[in-house]
Each structure stands twice: as structure tokens, then as C-alpha cells.
């Protein structure tokens, strides 16, 4: 992974969003900004990012939810990065 993306988040909610909303979730560097997250995801995974939402978790980690364009399939990207 890059210095911004720590690891993909694999939870039941993340899997539902991947299946039904074409979204992926990552734990990212706490100081990463949304444009930086967008650029890294687009360059590393060769996809088009439509939207990025971030949250700070109770464990003091930053969670980024990345919505992919309709042309890109979140399940294909997840299988390429080893989520399955």
C-alpha cells in the first residue's frame, strides 16, 4: 500500500456498500486530505473516483469511503487488491 492508504477495511457494512453502492473503504493516514486520497486511489487502482467521504473512528484512525464511477466495479478492484 502507499504511504496514504494503510489497508482496505473489510467489515460487513463495507461489503454491503461494495456490493450495492460501488464503494470501497480504506483506513488512511490521519493527515490525508480528500484530494490526496482521491489521487492515490485513482493512480494505484486505475479507477475513477466520484466521491470521497472521511470519518475519524473511535480508535483515532481515519476511514475513507470512496465511491467509484459506474464504469468501475468495486468488487473487481477488491479482488485485485486481495480483499477476497
From Swiss-Prot:
<comment type="similarity">
    <text>Belongs to the universal ribosomal protein uL23 family.</text>
</comment>
<keyword id="KW-0694">RNA-binding</keyword>
<dbReference type="GO" id="GO:0019843">
    <property type="term" value="F:rRNA binding"/>
</dbReference>
<dbReference type="InterPro" id="IPR001014">
    <property type="entry name" value="Ribosomal_uL23_CS"/>
</dbReference>
<keyword id="KW-0687">Ribonucleoprotein</keyword>
<dbReference type="GO" id="GO:0006412">
    <property type="term" value="P:translation"/>
</dbReference>
<protein>
    <recommendedName>
        <fullName>Large ribosomal subunit protein uL23</fullName>
    </recommendedName>
</protein>
<comment type="function">
    <text>Binds to 23S rRNA. One of the proteins that surrounds the polypeptide exit tunnel on the outside of the ribosome.</text>
</comment>
<dbReference type="InterPro" id="IPR012678">
    <property type="entry name" value="Ribosomal_uL23/eL15/eS24_sf"/>
</dbReference>
<dbReference type="GO" id="GO:0005840">
    <property type="term" value="C:ribosome"/>
</dbReference>
<keyword id="KW-0689">Ribosomal protein</keyword>
<dbReference type="GO" id="GO:1990904">
    <property type="term" value="C:ribonucleoprotein complex"/>
</dbReference>
<dbReference type="Pfam" id="PF00276">
    <property type="entry name" value="Ribosomal_L23"/>
</dbReference>
<dbReference type="GO" id="GO:0003735">
    <property type="term" value="F:structural constituent of ribosome"/>
</dbReference>
<dbReference type="InterPro" id="IPR013025">
    <property type="entry name" value="Ribosomal_uL23-like"/>
</dbReference>
<dbReference type="InterPro" id="IPR019985">
    <property type="entry name" value="Ribosomal_uL23"/>
</dbReference>
<dbReference type="InterPro" id="IPR012677">
    <property type="entry name" value="Nucleotide-bd_a/b_plait_sf"/>
</dbReference>
<comment type="subunit">
    <text>Part of the 50S ribosomal subunit. Contacts protein L29.</text>
</comment>
<keyword id="KW-0699">rRNA-binding</keyword>
Amino acid at each position: 500500500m502507499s504511504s496514504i492508504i494503510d489497508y482496505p477495511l473489510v467489515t460487513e457494512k463495507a461489503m454491503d456498500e461494495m456490493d450495492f453502492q460501488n464503494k470501497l473503504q480504506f483506513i488512511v493516514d490521519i493527515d490525508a486530505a480528500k484530494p490526496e486520497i482521491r489521487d492515490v486511489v485513482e493512480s494505484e487502482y486505475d479507477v475513477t473516483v466520484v466521491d470521497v467521504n472521511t470519518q475519524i473512528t473511535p480508535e483515532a484512525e481515519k476511514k475513507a469511503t470512496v465511491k467509484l464511477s459506474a464504469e468501475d466495479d468495486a468488487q473487481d478492484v477488491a479482488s485485485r487488491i486481495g480483499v477476497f
